Curated annotation (Swiss-Prot):
This is Paired box protein Pax-1. Residues 89-215 bind DNA. Residues 167-215 are annotated as: RED subdomain. Its main location: nucleus. Pfam families: PAX (PF00292). It comes from Mus musculus (Mouse). This protein is a transcriptional activator. It may play a role in the formation of segmented structures of the embryo. May play an important role in the normal development of the vertebral column. It comes from the Eukaryota. The lineage of its organism: Eukaryota, Metazoa, Chordata, Craniata, Vertebrata. GO terms for molecular function: DNA-binding transcription activator activity, RNA polymerase II-specific; DNA-binding transcription factor activity; RNA polymerase II cis-regulatory region sequence-specific DNA binding. The gene is Pax1. GO terms for cellular component: nucleus; transcription regulator complex.
Amino acid sequence: MKFTLGLGSRAWRVSWERAAAAAAGPGAGGALGSGSLRVSSRRGPRLARALPLCLSGGGGARALPDCAGPSPRRSGARQLAGPRAMEQTYGEVNQLGGVFVNGRPLPNAIRLRIVELAQLGIRPCDISRQLRVSHGCVSKILARYNETGSILPGAIGGSKPRVTTPNVVKHIRDYKQGDPGIFAWEIRDRLLADGVCDKYNVPSVSSISRILRNKIGSLAQPGPYEASKQPPPQPALPYNHIYQYPYPSPVSPTGTKMGTHPGVPGSAGHVSIPRSWPSAHSVSNILGIRTFMEQTGALAGSEGAAYSPKMEDWAGVNRAAFPTSPAVNGLEKPALEADIKYTQSASSLSAVGGFLPACAYPASNQHGVYSAPAAGYLSPGPPWPPAQAPPLTPHGAGVAVHGGELAAAMTFKHREGTDRKPPSPGGKATDALGSLHGLPIPASTS
């Protein structure tokens, strides 16, 4: 094989001989073997210097540019690649069979054609079918053309013009400092009324709320360098507004005592007053009832004067506020027979009389204090077995015989018990128990 490459100033020339052309055929091999193929090009020295050399599989060498010379194989491939490149377009097909690119505007030629057809009096639905463009796109283009006189598409993406300029933020800060309770929509109206913004660039209510929250909200809390410029805060305790009851302080005229630590001044203007009441962030003793009762000594109001802060002293409280109903009411409730089974002795009542509050003592009409079974004198129902003591009367008919005497005795005993005042609630409970059964029961007061 013979390969020659000649380069000129403005032209290049490639010539070669195919030694293996005889394999294709004797006639073609002789014709191709005797002659030489020349390919010339007038591309200039730059193309000659950047000439690509391609070695074929048969051992031959080729030096052909992409756009040069008659190469059957390469030209055919290029001709086939052209339609394929045209077919590989990016887009989708709509319901009318037209091709569109999602997110991109319609070409200006189609836009102009839509406007021209509309000026000829063709309906938008007919334009949509003829140009294979969706009806919404046609209507939108025509509406914009009638409003602005332009067929150009709007801006894709981008951002709106900035409305929260430093001047607007400054005015919003001034409005908020002048009136801390102002609303965002009121600030928007004042921006329009003062001429700071017009109706096109006025910020929305949400934007004003965001400015108040992010930019101006941080300015409300002074920094460390601004603390010296501001006047000292008022000596108001933060928990006075949380708790509605009076807080004992050294400056209060009531004269209540308050524990002060040594070395701490007790002046009213000093902020670091020792807190004997739990603060707003305290978790321990959150109700503070015991602390408050120990400090004040009694409950506030007219009711508190009658009670002592200690529960042990409540046994001597007057029971005039708790009226007792007649004991005959106990005989009128036969439905509570199930509760009568549980007996309770008088000694247990006298034992607990020293530390129970006055309202916890049972009245004379309660049935839980009976120590004898009540089936004999309460209702003519089925007889109950004796629990601890023998029945007062025989079962069954005993109710009819002794019912009147029992009621009269109980009424007399109850009237006698209400005439005199017992010295203590424990004694009253014992007396009521004795008046019910008509038997003297000794009670020990401890």
